Amino acid sequence: MENLGFAHYNLRAEWSVLEQLRDFYVEVVGLQLGPRPPFASRGFWLYAGAQDVLHLSEARPGEPREANVSGSFDHVAFRCRGLAACEQRLAARGIAVRRSGVPGTGIVQLFLRDPLGNGVELQFEEPEG
């Protein structure tokens, strides 16, 4: 087998929360709502450019989840542009952010949480100034 790279990740939640997640990932993270195949269940596909990177799938109320689902995931990272504008937008929305960096690379990282508490990293490679 040859691994060709990352395809997407999927978050499952009840419909009321799924709409909040959609709004967060579109309005805060900057993904775009795009086409989704006509599955029997409701959901959204969010895109970064032409690539679907996040699938939001409706979970039935009380749907059982594997115990390991909540215990091992730390965060997902997105490569971004526009650090200053992003920091201003996050501050204006009152979103808690932890700013960090990758030593020796010049990469700036902004860590935040989505409405379900999942970790999100916004990664910027551009020089500051």
Predicted segments — roles?
Residues D23, R89-R93:
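Short amphipathic alpha-helices in soluble, non-transmembrane regions
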Residues R12, A77-R81, R113:
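Short hydrophobic/aromatic beta-strand micro-patches
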Residues V69-L90:
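Mid-chain, well-packed structural core segment of small domains
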Residues F39-G43, S72, G104-V108:
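Short acidic/glycine-enriched loop/turn segments that link adjacent beta-strands
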Residues V53, A59-P61:
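Short, conserved turn/kink motifs that form compact alpha/beta structural patches or helix kinks used as
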Residues L11-V53:
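Core segments of cupin and vicinal oxygen chelate
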Residues M1-L4, A92-G129:
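Vicinal oxygen chelate
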Residues M1-R22, D74-V76, E128-G129:
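N-terminal beta-strand motif that seeds the catalytic metal site of vicinal oxygen chelate
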